[in-house]
Amino acid sequence: METTVKNSSSDGEWKVVLPSKGRQGRRRKPKPKGQAEEEEQPWKSDDLEIDPQRQARLKQKMEISLKKIESSSFYTAFLEQLKSPEVSNQIRLVLGSETQLQMVMYGIGSIESYESPRFQLSIAILMKREFDWVGDNIEVFDPVLSATESSYLESLGCSVLSVNEQARREALKPTLFFMPHCEANLYSNLLQANWRMDRLSKIALFGNSFQMYEEQVSFDAEVICATKRIIAAQRVTSEFAIETESDDYFAAFHDSSWHFFSSGIDSELPLFVSD
């Protein structure tokens, strides 16, 4: 019997999110994944007008989300995990001789339309306030962002990227990639762009559990292609799952983990024919 890799869905099922599936907070129409879609491209929002009234309403929504997250037991547990010896030691290894991680957020979704993206952005902002090792400038990209959303993000001190990197950024310096509930191919793109230990070791990744991808098997060719590098990376990955017991934050953060990469005596990265 065929089983599927699972992730976020309205009925609670966990399945791989492929580019044609979309996810909460995305307004683009489904389209097949082609060569051009996988390449880095200059980007401008389809919604070019900055609406002051919409921006004021968005600011109010974000203030509510920030306060709700900051006062929650979920956030308390989130901070405790980051400050634990196991995770903080991993962060120190990623930092190396540097003092800060550059934070890059891919696939945030529409913060104007949906609460889950606002919760995810709130966590990133609160991390920046809490930890000196989070860089001052948070870089953000999602092709669904409107001009109003981009303007608001910039008012928070974020930089909205003008190029769709397809998550193919090389980690030339210590980088925190903040990618909760992104499509599987974006994690694969990130890994492929950094498929050498001196690059992977500079990455802290917050996103879908790699272990979950490995545990759930599929015979679908597209799913196998999207997840093969994720599964191969497991041999050099230290994963720390976060707790999402509260229903309020389950949709935004369920099955999310911290991932760090380091090679051991008996582990090395496999070669892929496509590389």
UniProtKB/Swiss-Prot annotation:
Q: Which UniProt keywords apply?
A: Biological rhythms, Cytoplasm, Nucleus, Phytochrome signaling pathway
Query: InterPro entries this protein is in?
Result: SRR1-like (IPR012942), SRR1L (IPR040044)
Q: Where is this motif: Nuclear localization signal?
A: 26-29
| Pfam families the UniProt entry points to | SRR1
Polar residues bias spans: 1-11
User: Where is there biased composition of kind Basic residues?
Assistant: 23-32
Q: What induces this protein's gene, according to its Swiss-Prot or TrEMBL record?
A: By light. Not modulated by far-red light.
> Where does this protein chiefly localize?
cytoplasm
Name any GO cellular component annotation.
cytoplasm
Look up the coiled coil feature and give its residue ranges.
none
Q: Where in the cell is it found?
A: Cytoplasm; Nucleus
Keyword check for Nuclease: no
Does the entry feature the keyword Nucleus, yes or no?
yes
Residue stretches spanning the membrane: none
Q: Which GO terms describe its biological process?
A: circadian rhythm; red or far-red light signaling pathway; red, far-red light phototransduction; regulation of circadian rhythm
Q: Where in this protein does the record put region Disordered?
A: 1-49
Described by its record, this protein's role is as follows: Probable regulator involved in a circadian clock input pathway, which is required for normal oscillator function. Regulates the expression of clock-regulated genes such as CCA1 and TOC1. Involved in both the phytochrome B (PHYB) and PHYB-independent signaling pathways.
Q: Which family does it belong to?
A: Belongs to the SRR1 family.
UniProt protein name: Protein SENSITIVITY TO RED LIGHT REDUCED 1
Which gene produces this protein? SRR1
